[in-house]
């Protein structure tokens, strides 16, 4: 993956942007991360590393392609078991205000966030092909954010909305396979 798309790990646990922030991390010697929470949603797209995720008092093993969504105010942290392999992941923060804005456009944008808060099921495994599609959307968004291209400010929200709708559809169709098949 391109080095210029990576971000050095930041211990800051608050958003600087009003709507969202997206990071690609590739850490080799990450120090311990304390249990913390945010006032925004945190999507976590795991790629590599000997890591588990603690959410509340539960500890979950994670694997390549796992997606995690932590709602606002839920304590969580990664637990690094070994630094023998790099700890690679994308982290996508999105504000509650932006989610509410999308909800006004369509309730379909909020399905996943509502599902996670009600079910307390924070993890969604994916297969390699699905995760590659998600990774492509994440990289495209990072590249656009870091670019100075014509139309950048118009393109960025389209990419964010596309990513969110894709994730919502993915989870909805997994949880409602009969309905998805009848709609085809």
Kindly label every feature range from the protein language model:
Residues 2-21, 79-143, 169-174:
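A hydrophobic/aromatic-rich effector-binding and dimerization subdomain
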């Amino acid at each position: 993956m391109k080095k210029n798309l990576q971000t050095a790990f930041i211990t800051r646990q608050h958003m600087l942007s009003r709507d969202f922030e997206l990071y690609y991390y590739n850490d080799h010697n990450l120090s311990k991360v304390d249990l913390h929470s945010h006032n925004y949603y945190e999507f976590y797209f795991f790629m590599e590393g000997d890591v588990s995720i603690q959410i509340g008092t539960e500890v979950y093993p994670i694997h390549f392609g796992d997606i995690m969504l932590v709602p606002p105010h839920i304590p969580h942290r990664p637990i690094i078991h070994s630094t023998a392999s790099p700890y690679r992941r994308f982290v996508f923060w999105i504000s509650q205000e932006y989610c509410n804005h999308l909800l006004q456009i369509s309730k379909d944008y909020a399905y996943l966030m509502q599902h996670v808060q009600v079910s307390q099921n924070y993890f969604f495994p994916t297969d390699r092909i699905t995760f590659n599609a998600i990774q492509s959307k994440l990289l495209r968004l990072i590249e656009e954010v870091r670019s100075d291209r014509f139309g950048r400010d118009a393109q960025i929200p389209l990419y964010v909305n596309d990513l969110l709708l894709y994730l919502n559809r993915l989870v909805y169709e997994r949880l409602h396979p009969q309905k998805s098949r009848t709609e085809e």
